[in-house]
Amino acid sequence: MPLHRREAAPAKLNLTLHVTGRRVDGYHLLDSLVVFLDLGDVVTIAPGPLSLSLTGPFAPGLAAEPDNLCLRAARLAGREARITLEKNLPVASGIGGGSADAAAVLRALDASPRRPEALGADVPVCLASRPVRMRGVGEILAPLPALPELNVLLVNPGRGLSTPAVFKALARHDNPPMPEPLPDFPDAQALIGFLHECRNDLEAPAIALMPGIADCLAALRSAGAQLARMSGSGATCFGLFASAAEAQAARARIAGTNPGWWVAASGLAPAKH
C-alpha cells in the first residue's frame, strides 16, 4: 500500500435513470447513462490501524461508525489504513457520495475486490468513474465514447432522501429501457436532445415524498437550463446550460434567492484512460 495517497471521489450524475424491472430478491433493474463531475469528496489514506476521520462542510451529517462505507470498503479489501474523508457533497443526495467515497478508498488501497457491489449498487460504477451505460442492478457497465463537454449546475434543497423509500413509492417497475444501441452524440446539443427523450423514473415518487425537489427543478428551468432533471433517487437536481458562464450566472441567481439550498456549478470530470 502507498505510504500516503489522496484520491478524488467525484460526484456521480445519472443523466437518465430508467427502472426496467425488479428481481425476485427485490433489487431493481436499471438502465442509466452515468457521468462523473469535476467536483466531489476527497479520500486520503495513510499507514496505521483502520480508522476514519471526517472533515469538510458536510462531515456533521456523517458518523465514523463501523458501518461507514469507507471503513466497510477497507475491510472488504482486507487492508488497514488511517482514512480521512473530506466530505464536500451533501449526504443522501443522489449523486453517489457514499458509494464514490467507498470506491475512492478501494482505488487508494489498490484493491480490486471480486464483488464491490456488496458495498452498494453504485460502487462498481463509481469505481470506474467514467461515462458508462449502467444496467442490471448496477453491475453491468458498458463504457461510452468520450461525451461532449456539459455545463452542469447542481441544486439540492438541503435535505437528504432515503433511496429505499423512493423505490417503495415507485408506481411502476417495468418501464421501457433506453434505445439499443445508443445514438452518437457529436455535440452537447445532440446529447441534450437525446436526454429529453429519456427519463428519471424515480423523479415523480421522489417529488411525492419531498415536494421541494419540484422547486429545485422549477428554479433551474427558470434560470435558463436546457434540461432540468433529478439525479439518482434525489434529492439533488441538475440543469444543463449552453455555456459555463450561463451556469455560473444561474448558480448566483438560485443561491441568492434560496439560501438554504446547496448550489454548485461543474463540468464533466477529465476522462480516465
From Swiss-Prot:
Top-level EC class as recorded in UniProt: transferase
EC number(s) on file: 2.7.1.148
GO molecular function, a single term: ATP binding
Record field: catalytic activity: 4-CDP-2-C-methyl-D-erythritol + ATP = 4-CDP-2-C-methyl-D-erythritol 2-phosphate + ADP + H(+)
Binding site for ATP: 90-100
Keyword annotations: ATP-binding, Isoprene biosynthesis, Kinase, Nucleotide-binding, Transferase
GO annotation (BP), single: isopentenyl diphosphate biosynthetic process, methylerythritol 4-phosphate pathway
Pathway(s) annotated for this protein in UniProt: Isoprenoid biosynthesis; isopentenyl diphosphate biosynthesis via DXP pathway; isopentenyl diphosphate from 1-deoxy-D-xylulose 5-phosphate: step 3/6
UniProt-annotated catalytic positions: 12, 122
Domain of life: Bacteria
UniProt similarity note: Belongs to the GHMP kinase family. IspE subfamily.
Role summary: Catalyzes the phosphorylation of the position 2 hydroxy group of 4-diphosphocytidyl-2C-methyl-D-erythritol.
PANTHER family: 4-DIPHOSPHOCYTIDYL-2-C-METHYL-D-ERYTHRITOL KINASE, CHLOROPLASTIC
HAMAP family: IspE
Protein name, UniProt field: 4-diphosphocytidyl-2-C-methyl-D-erythritol kinase
Species this chain originates from: Paracoccus denitrificans (strain Pd 1222)
Gene: ispE
